Amino acid sequence: MKHTFVLFLSLILLVLPGCSAEKSSADTAKKTLTIYSTMSTDSERDTFRKLAAAFEKEHSDIHVSLHFPGNDYENMMRVRMAANDLPDLFDTHGWGKIRYGEYTADLRDMKWTQDLDPNLNSILKNKSGKVYAYPINQAKDGLAYNRNILDRYGIAPPETMDDFIKALRTIKEKSKGSIVPFWFAGYDKSSFAQYYDQFATPLLITDPAHNEKKQLINGTFQWSKFTYLSEILKQMQKEKLINIDAVTAKKSQLIELMAQNKIAFTMQGGTLGQDVAQINPNVKVGIIPTPAIHPGDDPIWIGGERYTLAAWKDSPQLKEAKDFIAFMARPANAKQMAEATSLPSGLTNVKADIFYANDYEYYQDVKVEPYFDRLYLPNGMWDVLGTVGQELAADILAPQDISQKLGREYKRLREQSETQGAENNE
């Protein structure tokens, strides 16, 4: 009996390695497609995961490995670029041509490129026709505002900086200080960087009489011409037109404060409107284009791609990477992602039902200008813009000091950067 049991156990042990090897072999046969994205909200990530799972069902030989590094994304990608070991697919977050261009596969032969929104051509294509990335959505940044407050005080959505300042003063006066006219989440310096970057375009680009494009490109721009934006921001702070805790306020506070009708304007877009509506459906959040600064100029959207999928040109799974992009570009899938991010699709054949759809339709004839830093500033200047904004609000630097610092950093970063934002028209 004992002999029989030992023999049986031996047979089991002989069979198990075979089963294990068979399973291991099946797993090994699957190709892993690694994807890195800058998506930040749960709704965005959940929808992306859902679509990735659907792709896996159609491609049983492929496993999709999604990664959302958050604030570590850029540093992680810099390390991987230095090692020439990029993910199979990755998010170019506005730097498809400038920073990642030499690493990306050309997608021009893919079917969806026929429906690429022309507003994205200057950002995602070069003169020879190379397409650097697939735009999951596109940004149209302006000013988010509380419709209830503007209606209550009889204020029309401002179209110029002068009108904007007047609106802020009216809100402060009529609310007796109970409402923050213009709210910043300055604990995250990107809040101030967004202000500078967004208003730099109407200040220095769109008005023909004040066009500094050539000077910004060739490095001769006089940064004293940038001082206006710091002066206006400081003026707003002195008049208490922005929140007194602008340097320490966090983004996590925004939704609740807006839902309580305590904020009139902010520069946060994305899912803000729908997030506020979930807390307080009676609060109506809208979005308007960035006001003009110079007399006679028009408001503009500041935009470009928000989330993208670029394929690493040296990826051993390049075919599979393109298959995934083609899957994401199907109209039904592209619509899902656009709606999850509450932004328009990057494709003209996709009409998404997003929160700000009526606003975008109302302002459909307003021109979209690319993000200022992506075209005219060297890599690294975004962080500098955010830092000087914090220093201005904390009374560490005066407006003129900020312009001098920006000039020094602009020169330094141009010299150390191999490619400049202004030199991306290859």
Curated annotation (Swiss-Prot):
Covalent lipid sites (N-palmitoyl cysteine): 19
Alphabetically sorted, this entry's keywords are: Cell membrane, Lipoprotein, Membrane, Palmitate, Polysaccharide transport, Signal, Sugar transport, Transport
Task: List the membrane topology term(s).
Answer: Lipid-anchor
The lipid modification S-diacylglycerol cysteine is placed on: 19
Q: Quick one: where is this thing mainly located?
A: membrane
The keyword Lipoprotein is assigned to this record = yes
Q: Report which superkingdom the organism of origin falls in.
A: Bacteria
Q: Name one Pfam family in it.
A: SBP_bac_1
Cellular localization per UniProt? Cell membrane
Upregulation: Repressed by the transcriptional regulator MelR. Induced by melibiose and raffinose.
Q: Where is the signal peptide?
A: 1-18
Q: What happens when the gene is disrupted?
A: Deletion of the gene abolishes induction in the presence of melibiose and raffinose.
Please report which protein family the annotation says this sequence is part of: Belongs to the bacterial solute-binding protein 1 family.
Q: Describe its assembly.
A: The complex is composed of two ATP-binding proteins (MsmX), two transmembrane proteins (MelC and MelD) and a solute-binding protein (MelE).
Function description: Part of the ABC transporter complex MelEDC-MsmX involved in melibiose, raffinose and stachyose import. Binds melibiose, raffinose and stachyose.
Q: This protein is called what?
A: Melibiose/raffinose/stachyose-binding protein MelE
User: Organism, per UniProt?
Assistant: Bacillus subtilis (strain 168)
Q: Gene symbol?
A: melE
